[in-house]
């Protein structure tokens, strides 16, 4: 093998191994948090904040419709 092919193979292997290592190390914290949440049990979601957010969204949507209806048609 010529040195340029050997260097190319080495660089490709280095990049692939770096991505695999980063992938595995990124899975470890998510796996730990998943196990902790499985042992603790799921928390009940606070739906009040979600409902208020949805009401605000509906209010803004109605205000936008009103504003657009007042604009002249060009």
Curated annotation (Swiss-Prot):
Residue numbers covered by the propeptide annotation in the UniProt entry: 46-74
Main location: secreted
GO cellular component, one term: membrane
Name of this chain's protein: Peptide BmKb1
Subcellular location: Secreted; Target cell membrane
Coiled-coil stretches: none
Similarity-based family: Belongs to the non-disulfide-bridged peptide (NDBP) superfamily. Short antimicrobial peptide (group 4) family.
Function noted in UniProt: Has antibacterial activity against Gram-positive bacteria S.aureus, M.luteus, B.subtilis, and Gram-negative bacteria E.coli, and P.aeruginosa.
Keywords associated with the record: Amidation, Antibiotic, Antimicrobial, Cleavage on pair of basic residues, Membrane, Secreted, Signal, Target cell membrane, Target membrane, Transmembrane
GO biological process, one term: defense response to bacterium
Signal peptide: 1-22
Species name: Olivierus martensii
Tissue distribution of the protein: Expressed by the venom gland.
Record PTM Lysine amide, positions in chain: 40
Keyword Nucleus: no
Highest taxon above the source species: Eukaryota
